[in-house]
């Protein structure tokens, strides 16, 4: 302010400090009535000052101020009280209760957008004054330019200067009108009467006036539809300030009472009501410290203000953002049309096809973000708005826009009408049921016609367009055909299939943000409002799906403005979909909190230069840089002060919480040693068996039944494949029937007693390699193979008990990725090698015939071959089916080698491409998953049908006995004598069997414990826990006992176990489009594994069908398992990099963080270990390959740590594999574990 406002001399000052030189000369003096004279002089002095203020315009050049002026200025600025309840409707004033003495004074935040509106406390006495003076208020009269109210106004507050800016919104004190300036001064009685009459004349003369801003608009009389009284109604735009002052003259009472009172009584009333009486404290005028954010409270009884009662807790929710733009429909009528939505990523509506595009990361222009920040800094921000309907919200938004001078008063109805237009969505035209109902907000056009037809003038600034209480419901009779019974609660409709599908992707308890942007020509400049509702409410037919709305953002403006409304709408939508920003929006108390959150968002944003991008490879660094920015953002978030109730505040609480977390992690670690014999086993039993009953109750789910069918084929196919190959390796001593029986019996026992029933136990490649090596060892030393297995089984039980007693399962932590990859790569190479070795052997036994030769001999050979083939097919116990030693297999059959090649290659390619088809783009996801999961059985079935259709070509079939009998009844029985079957078993071999038992135990230990580690990863969210010690004891002990019956040992099959766990995993349907699926729960139960084991055992009854499977088909499955096992092996990927230039290396950690030569050195060391293992496998010492394998563990711990740094080892030997649930092309269970099949 340039100068302090001039002090008007009140009657009180005239009483105590009279100034004789300023008295009117015509005033008579009566010594006997000195007190009355002084009061009269005070009144005259009061009028004189008003006239002087009107003539000088509020500021006198050269005016000097004394201490008395400053003292008066301080007193008046603190004690003057302006009656506010004149705006209150009569019924609301009657309902308002006085403030009790025990209650705290209530305050109401009423800051203007510039932060200048004070918060005023008001008592019941003010309402009485307002009711007494209500009769004098009437619509103002438009003053002439020569006598405008601004020329005669004066101010009593310290923040009101002589040169008042139009945007000031502080409450204005009364002003003197030009009519009062021309009043004659006569005697005391005549003067008082004239004063009262002229004040009445002023009020009546201004009844038909204009406010200068909205013609004919009543400014003071509250409308009947006014729902509540808000102190913010006192705020006016600058053009209305003078008129408001002219309407509030200092009239002590109404006209009828003034005529009955004497002059002294009127002066006393005026002095009491308008002057500063020393010793009497008026209600203080306090500034609002919160700034310009208006916490609007409308539509309720006057009660405790937001500062008096605790604010509703704003717990951040997941958000669903919808962008609506104001566009023209087919009939050229404006409507709000949905153009984009955000669940996590942006989805746009394609303009031509009106369908949703693919989810993508929103790319924003930097200018739109700056424009958004600028509009938020100067626009309307309403936090905790207490409204339940769209009309109520729109009404409050428009009111705030008018108050903050964003729009003119005459544009109020147009903006409100635009906000209440109909909302349309891309899914509306796809629904073939009844069309979408008109929303309550789409009645704006009807309301516009209603006001246009009425004779009333435009409503007051604070008058709602829709009168009545908030509980009023708007019901509209639609002209379209609807079912006769109308819902009682309003117009409703059933959810469409599109809505149900979209609702599944939106997280539970999510709250919506509605963004409304559009171009309107009736505005002269853009206007913005950001609204946060106190409680999330469902707005009828505003959103595409019925989600409660918490936030609204509105941006309207003319097309001439240099602003892209669509891009700004996308910017605020992307901000609201950002986790950090929408949490800040929930917890914001004022505008500055939102601006700070935008700045934090800009700090982590990436700006791309305006250059043309030729390929996606050029953008690889962008993703890396973005990850670094996000990591920095997370670190800064951890350093910030914790939010209330989210994290412990004190250091002591943090330390206590950390101790609890460490204790909980240690308690849940199943590999933690207790230091007591069998301590780990006891902990496993105590941890897992209390859930035993729930393991059966949780199986009552349709998903478990589907998993049984799927896992049955996943377990049967390897059993048949490995059984057929094992029969070939052991000369039918252990074949398909023994492997099927072992899988069934051990599976049933393990599912009933095991600690982790999600494990699927079965035969694997490493055990096949060991069985072949041990059979070769026994054959070369003339030892009985099955009897030697019995003694190995006894030693296995002893080793298992010793390992469990010493809690040795923790040793699995030392088996790193370095050893696992060598092991898996070795088994894959063996599978691939054995496949082609068998195929070459078939070509040797059945060579291709040339075109030359005797026709007779060829005919004879063909005749004998056909007779042999016919015997092979028709007789079930022939040489090719049963493998009896009395008969030889047919040799030299024509076309056998070629057909075997076709069957093997066909089986491999069908199974391999069906696996790829699972994650392709064809067909719905459910159909693709079913086809991909059953790829191996489908491949076997197709190739069996192909072989069955070719009748004149011989192929070797699978050897399966009839019924429950062993594969070779003439060679063995179901029970094996430990002392020897045909010859006594050497005693030295009984003791020496400990060495092969240790080797078998190493294989079973590694496979079982590593598989349990993979299944028990925290990413899988298992709740019932695992038991490493109990599972190892059961599997090894059952294998040792089964050796008495000539059954093979089993271990936890990695791929089948992971497949079983994935089949029982329930994924959350509330997954944002484009986001990775999240685990909701896992059906941890025992029934599926139990049923699968029983079904595998019952597969012996389909022996006739199994006997039709050619061995060449099993070779194709063998090749499939070898090739697919290479996926996910980092060692295999680094072998490719040896032949690749560095510029084509992938963007992975071990490439970026490790120098190329150091990475190749690590690969060479793994390759050297693999070559050593292969050399051992190729010699007579092949039985010792598990021992060589286990030596890679100390090699990695001792030797490699001296060659490579700790950082390099973390990059090259880190276990980064995570559970795979998404449908990425070429990614499945095999990518999750570097373990053999």
Swiss-Prot record:
Q: What does its record list under induction?
A: Up-regulated during osteoclast differentiation.
- One Pfam entry for this protein is HCO3_cotransp
Source domain of life is Eukaryota
Regions of biased composition (Basic and acidic residues) lie at: 38-48, 57-74
Query: How is the activity of this protein regulated?
Result: Inhibited by 4,4'-diisothiocyanatostilbene-2,2'-disulfonic acid (DIDS) and acetazolamide. Muscarinic receptor stimulation enhances activity through a Ca(2+)-dependent mechanism.
Q: Which GO terms describe its biological process?
A: amelogenesis; chloride transport; negative regulation of CD8-positive, alpha-beta T cell differentiation; negative regulation of CD8-positive, alpha-beta T cell proliferation; osteoclast differentiation; positive regulation of enamel mineralization; regulation of actin cytoskeleton organization; regulation of bone resorption
Membrane disposition: Multi-pass membrane protein
User: Which stretches does the entry tag as region Disordered?
Assistant: 1-238, 285-316, 445-466
User: What is the tissue specificity?
Assistant: Expressed in the choroid plexus epithelium (at protein level). Expressed in the parotid gland and sublingual salivary gland acinar cells (at protein level).
Give glycosylation sites per the record.
855, 866, 878
**What keywords is this UniProt entry annotated with?**
Anion exchange, Antiport, Cell membrane, Differentiation, Glycoprotein, Ion transport, Lipoprotein, Membrane, Methylation, Palmitate, Phosphoprotein, Spermatogenesis, Transmembrane, Transmembrane helix, Transport
Question: What positions are modified (Phosphothreonine)?
Answer: 253
Q: Which reaction does it catalyse?
A: hydrogencarbonate(in) + chloride(out) = hydrogencarbonate(out) + chloride(in)
Instruction: Name the residue ranges with Acidic residues bias.
Output: 119-132
* Modified residue annotations for Phosphoserine: 112, 131, 144, 170, 172, 239, 439
Query: Where does this protein have compositionally biased stretches of type Basic residues?
Result: 75-84, 93-109
- Give positions of region: Membrane (anion exchange): 704-1237
Q: Is Lipoprotein one of the keywords UniProt gives this record?
A: yes
A GO molecular function term, named singly, is: active monoatomic ion transmembrane transporter activity
Modified positions (N6-methyllysine) in chain numbering: 270
Q: List all topological domains (Cytoplasmic).
A: 1-703, 915-929
Extract the InterPro entries matched here: Anion_exchange, Anion_exchange_2, Anion_exchange_CS, Band3_cytoplasmic_dom, HCO3_transpt-like_TM_dom, HCO3_transpt_euk, PTrfase/Anion_transptr
- What functional role does this protein have? Sodium-independent anion exchanger which mediates the electroneutral exchange of chloride for bicarbonate ions across the cell membrane. Plays an important role in osteoclast differentiation and function. Regulates bone resorption and calpain-dependent actin cytoskeleton organization in osteoclasts via anion exchange-dependent control of pH. Essential for intracellular pH regulation in CD8(+) T-cells upon CD3 stimulation, modulating CD8(+) T-cell responses.
PANTHER family according to UniProt = ANION EXCHANGE PROTEIN, ANION EXCHANGE PROTEIN 2
- State the family named in the UniProt similarity comment for this chain: Belongs to the anion exchanger (TC 2.A.31) family.
Identification of the protein by name = Anion exchange protein 2
Organism name: Mus musculus
């Amino acid at each position: 302010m340039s100068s302090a406002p001039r002090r008007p001399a009140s009657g009180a000052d005239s009483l105590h400090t009279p100034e004789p030189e300023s008295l009117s000369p015509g005033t008579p003096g009566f010594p006997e009535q000195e007190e009355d004279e002084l009061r009269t002089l005070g009144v005259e002095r009061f009028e004189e000052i008003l006239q002087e203020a009107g003539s000088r315009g509020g500021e006198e050049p050269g005016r000097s101020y004394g201490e008395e002026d400053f003292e008066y200025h301080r007193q008046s600025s603190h004690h003057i009280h302006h009656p506010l309840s004149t705006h209150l409707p009569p019924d609301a004033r009657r309902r308002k209760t006085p403030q009790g003495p025990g209650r705290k004074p209530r305050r109401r935040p009423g800051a203007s957008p510039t932060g200048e509106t004070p918060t005023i406390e008001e008592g019941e006495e003010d309402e009485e004054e307002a009711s007494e003076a209500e009769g004098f208020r009437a619509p103002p009269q438009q003053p002439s330019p020569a006598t405008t109210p601004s020329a005669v106004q004066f101010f009593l507050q310290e923040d009101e200067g002589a040169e008042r800016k139009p945007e000031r919104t502080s409450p204005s004190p009364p002003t003197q009108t030009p009519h009062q300036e021309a009043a004659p001064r006569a005697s005391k009685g005549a003067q008082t009467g004239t004063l009262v009459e002229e004040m009445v004349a002023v009020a009546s003369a201004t009844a038909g006036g204009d406010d200068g801003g909205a013609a004919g608009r009543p400014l003071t009389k509250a409308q009947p539809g006014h729902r509540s009284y808000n102190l913010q109604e006192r705020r006016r735009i600058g053009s209305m300030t003078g008129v408001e002052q002219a309407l509030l003259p200092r009239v002590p009472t109404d006209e009828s009472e003034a005529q009955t009172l004497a002059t002294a009584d009127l002066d006393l009333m005026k002095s009491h009501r308008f002057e500063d009486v020393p010793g009497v404290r008026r209600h203080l005028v306090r500034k609002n410290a919160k700034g310009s954010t208006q916490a609007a409270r409308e539509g309720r009884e006057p009660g405790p203000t937001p500062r008096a009662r605790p604010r509703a807790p704003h717990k951040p929710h997941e958000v669903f953002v919808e962008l609506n733009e104001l566009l023209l429909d087919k009939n050229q009528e404006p409507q709000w049309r949905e153009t984009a939505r955000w669940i996590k990523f942006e989805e746009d509506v394609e303009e031509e096809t009106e369908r949703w595009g693919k989810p993508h990361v929103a790319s924003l222009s930097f200018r739109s973000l700056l424009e958004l920040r600028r509009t938020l800094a100067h626009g309307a921000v309403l936090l905790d708005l207490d409204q339940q309907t769209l009309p109520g919200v729109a009404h409050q938004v428009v009111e705030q826009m008018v108050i903050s001078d964003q729009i003119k008063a005459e544009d109020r109805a147009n903006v409100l009408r635009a906000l209440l237009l109909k909302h349309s969505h891309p899914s509306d035209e796809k629904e073939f049921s009844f069309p979408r109902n008109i929303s309550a907000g789409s009645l704006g056009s009807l309301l516009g016609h209603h006001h246009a037809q009425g004779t009333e003038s435009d409503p007051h600034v604070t008058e709602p367009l829709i009168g009545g209480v908030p509980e009023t419901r708007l019901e509209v009779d639609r002209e379209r055909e609807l079912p006769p019974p109308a819902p009682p609660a309003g117009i409703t409709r059933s959810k469409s299939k599109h809505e149900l599908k979209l609702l599944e992707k939106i997280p539970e308890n999510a709250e919506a943000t509605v963004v409304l942007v559009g171009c309107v020509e009736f505005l002269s400049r853009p206007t913005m409002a950001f609204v946060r509702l106190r409680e999330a409410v469902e707005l009828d037919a505003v959103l595409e799906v019925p989600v409660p709305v918490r936030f609204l953002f509105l941006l309207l403006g003319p097309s001439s403005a240099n602003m892209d409304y669509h891009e700004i709408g996308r910017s605020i939508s992307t901000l609201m979909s950002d986790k950090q920003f929408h949490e800040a929006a929930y917890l914001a108390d004022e505008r500055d909190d939102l601006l700070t959150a935008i700045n934090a968002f800009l700090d982590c944003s990436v700006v791309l230069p305006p250059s043309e991008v030729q390929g996606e490879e050029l953008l690889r660094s962008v993703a890396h840089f973005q990850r670094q920015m996000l990591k920095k953002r997370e670190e800064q978030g951890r350093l910030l002060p914790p939010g209330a109730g989210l994290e412990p505040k004190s250091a002591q609480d943090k330390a206590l919480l950390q101790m609890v977390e460490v204790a909980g992690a240690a308690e849940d670690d199943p590999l933690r040693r207790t230091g007591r014999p069998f301590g780990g086993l006891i902990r496993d039993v105590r941890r897992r068996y209390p859930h035993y009953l729930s393991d059966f109750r949780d199986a009552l789910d349709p998903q478990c039944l589907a998993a049984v069918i799927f896992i049955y084929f996943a377990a049967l196919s390897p059993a048949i494949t490995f059984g057929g190959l094992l029969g070939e390796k052991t000369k039918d001593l252990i074949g398909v029937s023994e492997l099927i029986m072992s899988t069934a019996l051990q599976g049933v026992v393990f599912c009933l007693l095991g600690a982790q029933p999600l494990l699927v136990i079965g035969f694997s490649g490493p055990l096949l390699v060991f069985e072949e090596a041990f059979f070769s060892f026994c054959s070369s030393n003339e030892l009985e193979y099955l009897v030697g297995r019995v003694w190995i089984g006894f030693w296995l039980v002893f080793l298992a008990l010793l390992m469990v007693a010493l809690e040795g399962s923790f040793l699995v932590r030392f088996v790193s990725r370095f050893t696992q990859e060598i092991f898996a790569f070795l088994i894959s190479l063996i599978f691939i090698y054995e496949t082609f070795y068998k195929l070459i052997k078939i070509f040797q036994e059945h060579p291709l015939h040339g075109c030359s030769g005797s026709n007779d001999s060829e005919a004879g050979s063909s005749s004998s071959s056909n007779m042999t083939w016919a015997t092979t097919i028709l007789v079930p116990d022939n040489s090719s089916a049963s493998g009896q030693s009395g008969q030889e297999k047919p040799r030299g059959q024509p076309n056998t080698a070629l057909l075997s090649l076709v069957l093997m290659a066909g089986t491999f390619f069908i199974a391999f491409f069906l696996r790829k088809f699972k994650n392709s783009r064809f067909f719905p996801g459910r159909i693709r998953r079913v086809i991909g999961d059953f790829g191996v059985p489908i491949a076997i079935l197709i190739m069996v049908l192909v072989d069955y259709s070719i009748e004149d070509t011989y192929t070797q079939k699978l050897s399966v006995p009839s019924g429950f009998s062993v594969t070779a009844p003439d060679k063995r029985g179901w029970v094996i004598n430990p002392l020897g079957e045909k010859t006594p078993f050497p005693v030295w071999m009984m003791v020496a069997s400990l060495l092969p038992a240790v080797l078998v135990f190493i294989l079973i230990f590694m496979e079982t414990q590593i598989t349990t580690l993979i299944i028990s990863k925290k990413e899988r969210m298992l709740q019932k826990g695992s038991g490493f010690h109990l599972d190892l004891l059961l599997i090894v002990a059952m294998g040792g006992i089964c050796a008495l019956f000539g059954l093979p040992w089993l271990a936890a099959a990695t791929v089948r176990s992971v497949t079983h766990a994935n089949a029982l995993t329930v994924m959350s349907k509330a997954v944002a489009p484009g986001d990775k699926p999240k685990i909701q729960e896992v059906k941890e139960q025992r029934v599926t594994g139990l049923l699968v084991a029983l079904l595998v055992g019952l597969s012996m009854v389909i022996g006739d069908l199994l006997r039709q499977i050619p061995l060449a088909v099993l070779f194709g499955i063998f090749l499939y398992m070898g090739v697919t096992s290479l996926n996910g092996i980092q060692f295999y990927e680094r072998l490719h990099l040896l032949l690749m230039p560095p510029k084509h290396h992938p963007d992975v950690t071990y490439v970026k963080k490790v120098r190329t030569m150091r990475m190749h050195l690590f690969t060479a060391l793994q390759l050297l270990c693999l070559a050593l293992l292969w050399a051992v496998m190729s010699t007579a010492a092949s039985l010792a390959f598990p021992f060589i394998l286990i030596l890679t563990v100390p090699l990695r711990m001792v030797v490699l740590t001296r060659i490579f740094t700790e950082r390099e080892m973390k990059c090259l030997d880190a276990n980064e594999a995570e559970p795979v649930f998404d449908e990425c092309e070429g990614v499945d269970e095999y990518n999750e574990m570097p373990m053999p099949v």
